Amino acid sequence: MPARQFPFRPHLDQFRNQAKDLLRDVRAEAQSALDDFREFHPERIDPSIAALADAQLVLARSYGASSWPQLAAAVTAIDAISHDDFEALRKVAAAHPDLARDRDRPRDGWHAPLASAADAAIRRLMLQLRERGVHSADALLARPELQPVLDTLRLLGRLGGSPAGDWVGGSVEVLRGSDFALLAEIGADVRASLGWAALVLETYARDPAGKHRILEVMASHGVPLPDSPPMALHRGRLDLLEEHLRRDPALLARTFAHEDIYPASLACHDEHTLALHGAPLAGATLLHMAVDYEDLDVARWLLDHGADVNARAEIDAAGLGGHTALFNCVVTYNAGRKDEPLARLLLERGADPNARASIRKGFAFSRDPSPHEYRDVTPLGWGRRFHDQGMVSHGALRLIAERGGHE
């Protein structure tokens, strides 16, 4: 751990003067200077013959740098970042690759002010991009003239900078996989907050491709995703589902507890209503999950591999449950979608439009979050009676009615 506190706005002249003072003190055999030399110099030096280079090395190491050139490079980099002189920054970083921060070590010594300066520069550049009409990673990558900005963001990330946590969380909340991947590339500490892993599972948004990419980025950064069928489904990993099915031929008929779908190991909430979905998923099958998450490819794979399109969720002691996956098409956080590929797929594969179930459902964060009970309803009846019509997909109701569905 560094013995000296590195200033957040350093100037190289400060350190030059400190090195001269240290040399003077060690030659005078001042105890504090002798202690510094004993702790930070790799060799035993006779104080009477100590040179300025020795004092500079000791001073640099007391600030957490490996050498005087590294300390000087860190000061130069901090100054360049503070003045948005990114050409100078590129030069010093190229000459001193040891400035790159190991994310597994804490921000201390000279790493702290360098990372702090890089944080601020990332925020400035991101705001400038927004002012230029660039609001997503895809938009940035589509503009070749902005490649230097992207390269600078990546460099700032290597130097220890991180994008603001609210930007990272925002990309997770709406499942913008490309944005999350870019933010991770430029320094977001994906492992720092398991809350982001919980959010990607529990969010109201529906974008399977974005969700899959976020989870794969998390996995590549060491987030410990459980090896379970629900997690394989969350990730859209058909290869993992195939392996789970090989090990458990009855898998597609199995039902899963809430904790299997939203694991506590990823900081998912104890309060079940904070996992945002349509028809209840606790006690439901993988097909119910795939339909609720609007993952057409996974739903089709499950049906192709023998999943029962009319499989029912568990029924609890109060007689609630028993719904089929078709119910998950009806009440949804994505009620305004323009197409209904999941409802169409289920009906084409033989889903009963008049299956009956009893469901207790409330929507957290809605106008009326309290749970309501709907006894012995069909998918059509549930949708028409549901207390918050803003959560009902009328496109799904229309398709169900066309297939003979009634209340």
Question: PLM features: residue spans?
Answer:
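Intrinsically disordered, low-complexity eukaryotic regions enriched in glycine, serine
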Residues: 1-91, 95-99, 106, 120, ...
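Short, hydrophobic/amphipathic alpha-helical patches that form generic packing surfaces
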Residues: 54-65, 116, 231-234, 289-292
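Short, structured interface segments
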Residues: 64-72, 209-223
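Ankyrin-repeat boundary/"N-cap" motif
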Residues: 76-79, 102-140, 162-176, 192-205, ...
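Conserved ankyrin/ankyrin-like repeat signature
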Residues: 88, 145-152, 178-179, 210-214, ...
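Ankyrin repeat domain, specifically the short helix-to-loop turn at the C-terminus of the second helix
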Residues: 93-99, 151-162, 181-189, 213-223, ...
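Terminal, low-structured helical/coil segments at or just beyond the last alpha-helical repeat
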Residues: 382-407
